[in-house]
UniProtKB/Swiss-Prot annotation:
This is Uncharacterized protein AF_0609. It comes from Archaeoglobus fulgidus (strain ATCC 49558 / DSM 4304 / JCM 9628 / NBRC 100126 / VC-16). The lineage of its organism: Archaea, Methanobacteriati, Methanobacteriota, Archaeoglobi, Archaeoglobales. Pfam families: DUF433.
Amino acid sequence: MERMVVDSKVMVGKPVIKGTRIPVDANVRIRNLQFY
């Protein structure tokens, strides 16, 4: 459940924030580390 919610947020956040691609990836990695 949590994983799907994170994926939804990432999917929604990626297209919205195109200019800040690197920070988004960093946030995704941090979130994955926290969840796993």
